[in-house]
Amino acid sequence: MLDTKFDELMEFPASFPFKVVGDASDTLQDRVVAVVQGLAPGDYAPSTKASSKGTYYSVTIRVTVTSKEQIEKLYTQLAELEGVKRVL
């Protein structure tokens, strides 16, 4: 598990943005939403932007999180998605 200090810095529940950067893929946004739905079910409206050369996509999604552990699980599972380079 990650060693973060989210519990010291935040009050829960909280709205928390995740930005997932990965290889350009038409399915990246759907895969990000599927991971988020598995840990924090809700109605999400993520935004996707292509890099200047179109090589990468970034998907930004705002999630209502309820604990430090939930944030850590989201970071871990999003980072494990195929083609993902970074989770910010």
UniProtKB/Swiss-Prot annotation:
Pfam families per record: DUF493 (PF04359)
SUPFAM superfamilies named among the record's database cross-references: YbeD/HP0495-like
Cellular component annotations (GO), alphabetically ordered: cytosol
InterPro entries recorded: UPF0250_YbeD-like (IPR007454), YbeD-like_sf (IPR027471)
Domain of life: Bacteria
Signal peptide: none
Protein family membership: Belongs to the UPF0250 family.
Protein name per the record: UPF0250 protein swp_3927
Organism: Shewanella piezotolerans (strain WP3 / JCM 13877)
